[in-house]
Design a protein with these regions (language model features):
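Membrane-cytosol interface segments of multi-pass membrane proteins
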Residues: 1-162
Length: 162
């Protein structure tokens, strides 16, 4: 007769180092994809780097897996407010810093003789970027105050849905 009262669960590691390494290479692929748009490369290299844009999709999937692993391992359900606060604290300070820097550049540009497309950087698009909702309502004429921040907007949407 066994004195075990239930199934034994192996402890989950808090950090998934191999997956962190994979995320690094996915992010590197995305960076190289963006740079290859500016380079003249042989067709084979351009084709390979063009496919690296798929790293964003895999990065999102992997990040979702890691977040689920970290936040759903205990018996108790995670505290939704603490989850959102932790995610906000992780992504928003750097986002705000870059956005304010971009605002400064747009403000200074005419003073130093750099011409900007009329109406390109406007208050509506700035507000959407500030509140991380710019990817929720994309428009063809939308100004990219911080182009890569579309992914933060998509992440924030996923966090709210989590």
């Amino acid at each position: 007769m066994s004195d075990r009262s239930g199934p034994v669960r192996a402890p989950f590691p808090d950090v998934l180092d191999p997956l962190t390494g994979v995320r690094f290479f996915l992010a590197l692929g995305v960076v190289l994809f963006h740079y290859q748009l500016q380079w003249t490369l042989p067709d084979e290299a351009a084709g390979l780097l063009n496919r690296a844009r798929l790293g964003v999709d895999v990065f999102f999937i992997l990040s979702g897996f890691i977040l689920t692993h970290v936040y759903l391992q205990g018996e108790d359900p995670p505290d939704y407010r603490r989850f959102l606060a932790a995610r906000f604290a992780r992504i928003y300070p750097a986002h705000l810093f870059i956005l304010v820097a971009m605002l400064g550049l747009v403000w200074i540009a005419p003073m130093v003789g750099v011409g900007l497309e009329q109406g390109r950087f406007n208050a509506v698009d700035f507000a959407g970027t500030l509140f991380l909702v710019q990817a929720w309502f994309p428009r063809e004429t939308m100004a990219l105050w911080n182009g890569p921040a579309w992914s933060l907007s998509a992440e924030w949407f996923a966090y709210l849905a989590f």
